[in-house]
């Protein structure tokens, strides 16, 4: 197994959107890997301890255990953020496991000038409270733009 294949395989699983082994086979083939079949994917899933779990959309998908996919400061932000939602009072950001505090720290550093009063972060969820002078829709757009353009 090549390092490139291993890296691509792990990146696909970290996206948390592949529900079948055949979907993983197809995605790797689209990336140019040859000799990939369902049995090889099955062995790789076992080797890396992948499990099937529900993603934020409640779909059953393959993913790596938390300790293998711990985010770091060089991880692209858009890969760490799974969903951004809001109501009239606050914004809720869903992240990959372990990434919430890293992203909350970034948002706190942006601070009041961008309309962020403060954040509360757990393991994979962040609550963002806007300042009174910034409409929540505008803050939501700023946050989404930040994640789209980051790294």
Curated annotation (Swiss-Prot):
Keywords: Amino-acid biosynthesis, Arginine biosynthesis, Cytoplasm, DNA-binding, Repressor, Transcription, Transcription regulation. GO terms for biological process: L-arginine biosynthetic process; protein complex oligomerization; regulation of arginine biosynthetic process. It comes from Haemophilus influenzae (strain 86-028NP). This is Arginine repressor. The keyword Aminoacyl-tRNA synthetase does not apply. Pfam families: Arg_repressor, Arg_repressor_C. Signal peptide: none annotated. GO terms for molecular function: arginine binding; DNA binding; DNA-binding transcription factor activity. Belongs to the ArgR family. It is found in: Cytoplasm. Transmembrane segments: none annotated. Pathway: Amino-acid biosynthesis; L-arginine biosynthesis [regulation]. Gene3D superfamilies: 3.30.1360.40, Winged helix-like DNA-binding domain superfamily/Winged helix DNA-binding domain. Regulates arginine biosynthesis genes. InterPro entries: Arg_repress, Arg_repress_C, Arg_repress_C_sf, Arg_repress_DNA-bd, WH-like_DNA-bd_sf, WH_DNA-bd_sf. It comes from the Bacteria. Its main location: cytoplasm. One of its GO terms (cellular component) is cytoplasm.
């Amino acid at each position: 197994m090549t390092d490139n294949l291993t890296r691509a395989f792990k990146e696909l699983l970290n996206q948390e959107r592949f529900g079948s082994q055949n979907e993983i086979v197809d995605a790797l083939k689209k990336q140019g890997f040859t000799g990939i079949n369902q049995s090889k994917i099955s062995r790789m899933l076992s080797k890396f301890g992948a499990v099937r779990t529900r993603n934020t959309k409640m779909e059953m998908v393959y993913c790596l255990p938390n300790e293998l996919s711990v985010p770091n400061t060089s991880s692209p932000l858009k890969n760490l953020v799974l969903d951004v939602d809001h109501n009239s009072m606050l914004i809720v950001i869903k992240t990959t496991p372990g990434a919430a505090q890293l992203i909350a720290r970034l948002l706190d550093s942006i601070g009041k000038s961008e309309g962020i009063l403060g954040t509360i972060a757990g393991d994979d969820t962040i609550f963002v409270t806007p300042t009174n002078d910034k409409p929540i829709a505008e803050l939501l757009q700023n946050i989404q733009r930040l994640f789209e353009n980051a790294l």
